Structures are given as structure tokens and as C-alpha cells.
From Swiss-Prot:
Location within or outside the cell: Membrane
CDD domains the UniProt entry points to: MFS_Tpo1_MDR_like (cd17323)
Domain of life, per lineage: Eukaryota
Organism: Gibberella fujikuroi (strain CBS 195.34 / IMI 58289 / NRRL A-6831)
GO cellular component, one term: plasma membrane
Transmembrane annotation, as ranges: 42-62, 86-106, 108-128, 139-159, 172-192, 199-219, 269-289, 306-326, 353-373, 379-399, 417-437, 447-467
Primary gene name: bik6
Family: Belongs to the major facilitator superfamily.
The keyword Transmembrane helix is annotated on this UniProt entry: yes
Protein name: Efflux pump bik6
InterPro entries: MFS, MFS_dom, MFS_trans_sf
Protein task: Efflux pump; part of the gene cluster that mediates the biosynthesis of bikaverin, a red pigment also considered as a mycotoxin.
Length: 485
């Protein structure tokens, strides 16, 4: 598809608005992404979700081959395991660059160009001749592959109205949770079949390249300011009226100024109690998701002596828990929709929190159950697998509700709030796999999981606090007071 078809056809000269400011023309203007046909909105959301899915899949599939990498290159397991952590650390740094790029050049190519480079680095990992190459290529695969992670949320906001976007955001969010649970299972199958760890990376590069081609062909630009700027430029050429312009061109932020904003403001927002507390909570549950890469391998692989594929199957229980929680979040959108209508279609952040309030208890219970039904205490694996399911339920409800609450609370500053959240949670998730294995070996899965469960209990009051006093807290915040209307 060319850009003209992406824009929905040739612009008409009479589309220029009064005052020489070019804008969309109401609900009938198909150039406005929020007026796209439902089918186009659905497949666009699906493409963005899959694009994000494969890079989060890449973050986890590597773990299945860690032991082989350690043996082949004669390094410790901890050094080989750093390949997982370095890619996730790349997730923390990349959005600081890609987010401002998308504000200047739109959503599509600032996401896809780095994504292509990330896929190339996956092939670099697959053909590596030493451990240094593996670690370097994994890190840069994370930096460049993080582009859709930082941009997809904005794309969904571009094309769905506030009342509609709850379900698409849940469906997108589940890809962040589901892909890391499938990665170890598929990776374990490659290892068990004798293909070796390199084919886990070849597979990653192949699926990312295929996704890149699909996106290049079928994804359309959706950033309203960029679309209106292009429209104004086209009208200036066709009419000769060079005073025509988009509202966004009156300020024309540069990439340098946006880079400064995206580097500084996210850390300023961490001083806000809402952003800080929810970032701590989401970072912890996200880190536990990646800690599972090690804890499951230890519990089901080493201690229960299951094979390389079977030992990864408990991730299916985690996935089922995530899907169950996603359904609960979608159901909560009915409640949210009623609150939105009652509030004159202005966001009601606190209406996002009920799933999180319940899910927090499931998360804590799951961690306790996993730890105290480990092989040292219970011979049957099923109680611990039920604990894994509850952990999945809790993770998804906490993660998705928190991000939706941040978007509704910080409105025009939501991108910075999400950037701060992404940075902190990625740093935490990258760090956990480095120490979970030695910690569990030293104090046991039971006490290790108990420590994590106790931390989660300390965080339980957060959604209740914001549900009751969130409006007052928002009204006092420099960045959140705009959501109090």
C-alpha cells in the first residue's frame, strides 16, 4: 500500500478549515483514524499486538537454551543467563528514544525500522561464535525491539474512542503476558528435538521478519497530528495557499526538545505518589513473571526431574490465568462504560481498579501456594500448578488495571507516565532472573516464594487507597490534576 491509499484517498481542496487551520471534518471524515471502519480498527490493533508479541516472545524463548549456551561456550550458567536480562534491560532504554521519534514522524516507521534491526540482531545471536557476541546482540535486540512496546499503546489510543478502547487495550496487554509464557515451551521443544539453542534465535528472527513485512504492507499511519500535517502540506501544494497549516505546526516541537522531555519528565513523574506506587507494583509483578523462567526450571526441571518440554508446561497454567484475568478486565469495561457515561464521557480512572483489587489477593495467594507446595513439601505437582494459575490471574489484573489507571489519570502526560513505568519495570524484570536461581538454591523455593509473597501483601492496599481517595490525590498532583475536571 502506498501513503495515498493509507490516507484514504486524495484530499479535497475544500477541506481547509476556517482560519487556515486544517482539521478533520467530523464523524464522516475517514481520514480520521477514529472514524476508520471497525474491521480496519480490529486488524490494525491485531497487527500492533502481534508485533509486540514477538519481541516479548524473544525475551523468554532464550531461557530454554541457557544450559546449552553455558556448556558450549564454557561459561557459568549465570553468565549465559545474562542474555535474558540484557534484552529486557534494552526494553528499559529503547522507549526513551522511540517515543519522541513517533511524536515527530508518526507511529508506523519509528516502530518498524527499529523492529527490523532487532530481527537482524536475532540472527546475529543465532550465528554467534562467542558469548560476548550473544550478550551484545541480545542487548541491542532489546533496545531496537522495544519500539512497538513504547508505541503500540499510543496507536490504540489513536484509533479507538475512550469508551471503545478498554477491550483493545486488554487484548494488546495480554500479548505482553502471553508471549513470555509460550517462549519457554516452544524453546524447550527445540532443545528436546535436538535442534539446539541456535534455532530458538533463528525462529525469533524469522517470525519478526514476517511480521515486519505484514506491518509494512498493511499498517496505516494513525497519529492525528502527523496525518493533519501531511494533509496541510498537500493542500498547500494543490491550492497555492501557503497559510494553510495543521494546529500542531504552530508549535512544531523538534526531536531534540521531545527527547529532552521524554528523558526528564518520566523521572519527574515518579515523584507523583500515584505514578510511583503503581510503578512499584507493576514492576514487581512484571519481575515475578520473568523470575518464573528460573523458578519453574528449578522446581519442575531440576527438582521434579521433568524433561525440557514437560518442565516448561506449567507456563500454560500461567497463560490460562492471564487469559482468565483478561476476560475479567473485559467484563469490567461494562462497569467502566457506565461510569464514563455518568461522567459525561470523561475518563473515570478509579473505575479501572476493581479487577486489580481482587487480583492482588490472587497474586499473593499464588506465590504462597507455589512455594509451600513445592516438591519438598508436596509430591503432587498440581497444587503448585494451581498456584501458578493464581499468579497469572493476579499478574494480568494488576498489570493491565495499573496501566489503564495511569493513562486515565495523567491524560496528556500519560506517555511520560507509561515511559517511567516501562523503564522501571524493565530494569526490575531484567534484574530478577540474575538472582532468583541462586536465591532459591540457597534458601529454597518455599522461603524464596514466601519473601516475594510478603512483598506482594505489602502492596495490596495500593488499589484500595486510590479507589477511595484517588480523586483527592489526583487533584493535588501537578501532572494528574487535569483528570479531575
Amino acid at each position: 500500500m502506498n501513503e495515498e491509499s493509507n490516507m484514504g484517498g486524495v484530499f479535497k481542496e475544500e477541506e481547509a478549515q476556517s482560519g487556515d487551520v486544517v482539521d478533520f471534518e467530523g464523524d464522516s471524515d475517514t481520514h480520521n483514524p477514529q472514524n476508520w471502519p471497525m474491521g480496519k480498527k480490529v486488524y490494525t490493533t491485531a497487527l500492533w499486538a502481534l508485533t509486540t508479541c514477538w519481541i516479548t516472545f524473544a525475551s523468554a524463548i532464550y531461557s530454554a537454551g541457557t544450559a546449552e549456551i553455558s556448556e558450549e561456550f564454557h561459561v557459568s550458567y549465570e553468565v549465559a543467563n545474562a542474555g535474558t536480562s540484557l534484552l529486557i534491560f534494552g526494553f528499559a532504554l529503547g522507549p526513551m528514544l522511540w517515543a519522541p521519534l513517533c511524536e515527530v514522524y508518526g507511529r508506523k516507521w519509528p516502530a518498524l525500522a527499529p523492529y527490523f534491526i532487532s530481527a537482524a540482531f536475532a540472527f546475529g545471536t543465532a550465528t554467534a561464535k562467542d558469548i560476548q557476541t550473544i550478550l551484545i546482540t541480545r542487548f541491542f535486540a532489546g533496545v531496537f525491539g522495544s519500539s512497538p512496546i513504547s508505541i503500540t499503546g499510543g496507536s490504540i489510543v489513536d484509533i479507538w474512542t475512550p469508551r471503545q478502547r478498554g477491550t483493545p487495550m486488554v487484548c494488546y496487554g495480554i500479548t505482553i503476558a502471553a508471549a513470555p509464557t509460550l517462549g519457554p515451551i516452544i524453546g524447550g521443544a527445540f532443545i528436546a528435538s535436538g535442534c539446539g539453542w541456535r534455532w530458538t534465535e533463528y525462529l525469533t528472527g524469522i517470525v519478526m521478519m514476517v511480521q515486519f513485512v505484514l506491518d509494512a504492507l498493511w499498517l496505516d499511519e494513525s497519529h492525528a497530528d502527523v496525518l493533519l500535517t501531511r494533509k496541510a502540506s498537500r493542500l498547500r501544494r494543490s491550492t497555492g495557499n501557503f497559510s494553510l497549516h495543521a494546529k500542531w505546526e504552530e508549535t512544531s516541537p523538534t526531536f531534540k526538545s521531545l527527547l529532552s522531555t521524554y528523558l526528564v519528565r518520566p523521572f519527574q513523574m515518579l515523584l507523583d505518589p500515584i505514578c510511583l506506587l503503581l510503578t512499584i507494583y507493576t514492576s514487581f509483578v512484571y519481575a515475578i513473571l520473568y523470575a518464573s523462567l528460573e523458578s519453574f526450571a528449578l522446581e519442575y526441571g531440576r527438582f521434579r526431574r521433568w524433561g525440557p518440554v514437560v518442565s516448561q508446561l506449567p507456563f500454560l497454567s500461567l497463560l490460562i490465568g492471564c487469559l482468565f484475568a483478561a476476560a475479567a478486565n473485559i467484563f469490567n469495561n461494562i462497569y467502566y462504560g457506565k461510569k464514563l457515561v455518568a461522567n459525561n464521557f470523561k475518563p473515570v480512572p478509579e473505575a479501572r481498579l476493581p479487577p486489580m483489587m481482587v487480583g492482588g489477593f490472587a497474586f499473593s495467594a499464588g506465590l504462597f501456594l507455589f512455594g509451600w507446595t513445592s516438591v519438598e513439601h508436596v509430591s503432587s505437582p498440581w497444587p503448585s500448578i494451581i498456584g501458578v494459575f493464581l499468579t497469572g490471574v493476579g499478574f494480568t489484573t494488576i498489570f493491565q488495571s495499573s496501566l489503564q489507571y495511569l493513562v486515565d489519570t495523567f491524560t496528556r502526560y500519560s506517555a511520560s507516565a507509561i515511559a517511567a513505568n516501562t523503564f522501571v519495570r524493565s530494569m526490575a524484570a531484567g534484574a530478577f532472573p540474575l538472582f532468583v536461581w541462586p536465591m532459591y538454591e540457597k534458601i529454597g523455593i518455599d522461603w524464596g516464594s514466601t519473601i516475594f509473597a510478603c512483598i506482594s501483601v505489602l502492596l495490596l492496599p495500593a488499589p484500595f487507597l486510590f479507589f477511595k481517595w484517588g480523586y483527592r490525590i489526583r487533584a493535588r498532583g501537578e501532572f494528574s490534576k487535569l483528570s479531575t475536571y
